[in-house]
Amino acid sequence: MALVVVAVVMVSILGGITLLTHVYSLNGIKNKTVGNGQHGTARWATKKEIHDTYAEVPFNPKEWRKGNCLPTEQGLVVGCKGTKFDTTALVDTGDVHALMIGAAGVGKTAYWMYPCIEYALATGMSFLSTDTKGDIMRNYGTIAQKYYGYNISVIDLRNPTKSNGNNLLHLVNKYMDMYQKNPKMLVYKAKAEKYAKIIAKTIILSGMDAASFGQNAYFYDAAEGLLSATILLVAEFCEPEERHIVSVFKIIQELLAPAKGKGNKGKNQFQTLMELLPDEHKAKWFAGAALNTAEQSMASVMSTALSRLNAFLDSELEQILCFDTEIDAERFCNEKSAIFLVMPEENPNTFFMISLIIQQLYREILSVADENGGKLKNRCVFFCDEFGTLPKIESAEMMFSASRSRRLQIVPIIQSFAQLKRTMVRKAVRLLLIIHNSQYSVVLLQTAARQMYCQKHLAAEQS
């Protein structure tokens, strides 16, 4: 009798399990993307979709470095497949950005950036990379120059005395010299003025949000114009070895003193200097907002400009800023070039220079692209490691939208979204613009739970 009871119980349990399995089976869900219990549209791509979307390129650096079988499709390596003996890279050849998320030590550089850089070298793409340890520069600087024929520039903020130069006024000086040799070529003068304005805007807005200026907007705008005017004066009249940003600071500081002589009451020496220029000189026009104001306001404008230039007063930084740029924006866009930026973790006060260089190079690249019909002849990439630790980049979200159509790709690498929220964008809308303008989000984290959380955050809250 006991055995019969046990048998009945076991049959009942098995029957209940079978019934529950049938009721809650996934077979009852129709083959639809949404609308039958699913949330969101995210799903895994099929093999056919992967094959149709990406270029499949045999990844063979040994042959590439010998000049054999070089790939022709420029783009980002977003995946791979293959066996132990051969690897095929999956390359997106479109104008896309990629957001890399990974905690320290998970292999962001070794397992993803190195293949991307190797492929960029093989296809002739110019690139800029930021690095805290200097590994990228040490491992790929010589390879890029020796095997792929690249122009190399290393801006090493850890060892400035061993660094290449990066004169912010390089392009202004270049076109001012060309204009003085050919006074009839107004296009050279126009380019010098354009790059002077780019430098001034980059310096004034570096690490700041123009929307937060409020009632002080006049002083920042006028300081930008005054800075543009001074840069033009330095490029036009100073000796070649003195045409750099430190000279701009020294001139503004010295000309802040009151003017001497009769008829100069209430004026400073900057205003007196401007009176010596012809009326049609653009430097006089750029500084117009500051010149045509009260004495106290004029002093405030000049003090604002000086305060934005204070960061450049460093004996080590001057070893970089006071010498000619190895690779300017035009050479970067038109020739195979690689710029390695090394930022010291032990001295974060120098990080502003990285943000400044990125912003200036970006704005100058847009200018080069506009001169070539709106697109660069050769695709360029910014590999921005530790993007989240850099000082705030003004209108960072606009960089992602404006650069894409110009054939400039940006690859920001962060450790978490909290970094972007803290340093780059304070408004949720701007953060979403950066995420949504990054067509790829590469997640590489140590724990599966954390990785699932990030993937869920990127795809949708209910996917």
Residue positions per predicted region:
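Basic- and hydrophobic-enriched, low-structure N-terminal and domain-boundary segments
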Residues: 1-106, 110-118, 123, 161
